[in-house]
Design a protein with these regions (language model features):
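N-terminal hydrophobic or amphipathic segments with adjacent small-residue motifs
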Residues: 17-20, 43, 113, 198, ...
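Pocket-edge positions in alpha/beta enzyme catalytic cores
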Residues: 16-18, 44-47, 92, 202, ...
Length: 339
């Protein structure tokens, strides 16, 4: 009887081992290949110094794994429950356990954040976006000049200058320059209001005209309350057929920022030089924020045609050239050292 009992125990052990092996193989195959990314992308934060248990629990709370304990067991079984990368991840529902473990260990999916300040042009945006996406600058430059993408986004300019809305963006791992640029233009479209389109008809201006004007206002204004007044100066000049004579357009044309625009700068041959060419420039010179767009659409009701900057960022606004000349002289005199 003892030999039969021993044989039964041996059979049971073999069956249990076989079941365990099947379970392990099945779990491994499911973890490696089961599930396809689908559904929303969620943000998961893995604190610095966190254990794999903490990371697994975070994935569980986000609904990315149904059983954090089994997920930990799978990672331990495959020898990959160490050396995870801390940070904030953007991960899509439906990913396999294998891909999630790989993401945690390699930092794949780590959120990449970029803040575009108001008034930045493509000269600043392109290298900043390239650094965040970890791609060559030329690939981002190609994306913003992609005529097919510009046409697809229904924009009336050869590049995306002015339409990459200034804001803070979160990009997932492996986001392409084209996808990032599209997100930024879509943010612009989301900010643009239907009543602004109606306002264009009242002003007899195109949206590109307004964005171009708003970009100049953005570069000129230091104080928020002066934006509508600066806008009014340019609207008044346009109405009277006067050249805008906006220094930021000259700086854009020469590709450099000078503290003071020189006579040599003013002579630059460019359609963006509003000293030499009447009317608005061909397109925006920077990315304006919402406040500057609103100022371009709704200028203050003032008669001013001139303004000059004071050292503290304020501007002196005047109606006649004589008054403007006097204001400049007063500012120059005030800056001279007293004896």
């Amino acid at each position: 009887m003892r030999s039969g009992w021993r044989r039964s125990r041996r059979r049971l052990a073999l069956v249990a081992a076989a079941v365990a092996l099947v379970a392990v193989v099945g779990l491994t195959l499911f973890a490696a290949y089961g599930g396809r990314p689908s559904g929303p992308v969620v943000r998961v934060t893995v604190p610095s110094g966190a254990t794999f248990r903490v990371a697994a629990d975070s994935l569980g709370r986000a609904g990315l794994v149904a059983s954090p304990s089994l997920f930990r067991w799978y990672a331990r079984l495959t020898g990959r429950d160490r050396d995870i990368k801390a940070g904030t991840y953007l991960l899509q529902h439906g990913r396999s356990w294998n891909s999630l473990v790989n993401a945690l260990r390699a930092g794949q999916g780590l959120e990449r954040r970029l803040t575009i300040p108001e008034g930045w042009s493509l000269r600043e945006i392109v290298p900043a976006l390239a650094r965040v996406l970890d791609v060559p600058v030329d690939s981002v430059r190609a994306a913003v000049r992609d005529t097919a993408l510009v046409h697809e986004l229904d924009l009336p300019t050869p590049t995306l200058e002015g339409y990459l809305f200034p804001d803070t963006y979160s990009f997932a791992y492996n986001t392409t320059p084209r996808a990032a640029v599209r997100d930024m233009v879509e943010r612009f479209e989301a900010v643009w209001q239907p009543d602004w389109t109606e306002r264009l008809q009242q002003l007899a201006m195109s949206r590109n005209d307004i964005v171009a004007l708003a970009s100049i206002v953005e570069k000129e204004a230091v104080l928020p309350e002066e934006r509508p007044v600066i806008s009014a100066v340019y609207h008044n000049r346009l109405r009277l057929g006067m050249p805008l004579q906006a220094d930021p357009t000259v700086q854009y044309a020469i590709g450099e920022h000078h503290e003071h625009v020189t006579f040599k700068d003013l002579a630059v041959q460019s359609p963006y030089n509003t000293y030499r060419h009447p009317g608005l420039p061909p397109g925006p010179i920077a990315s304006p924020g919402r406040a500057s767009i609103e100022a371009a659409l709704y200028p203050a009701s003032v008669p001013y045609l001139y303004f000059v900057a004071r050292p503290d960022g304020h501007h002196e606004f005047r109606t006649t050239f004589k008054e403007h000349t006097e204001a400049k002289e007063q500012i120059r005199h005030a800056q001279q050292p007293r004896r």
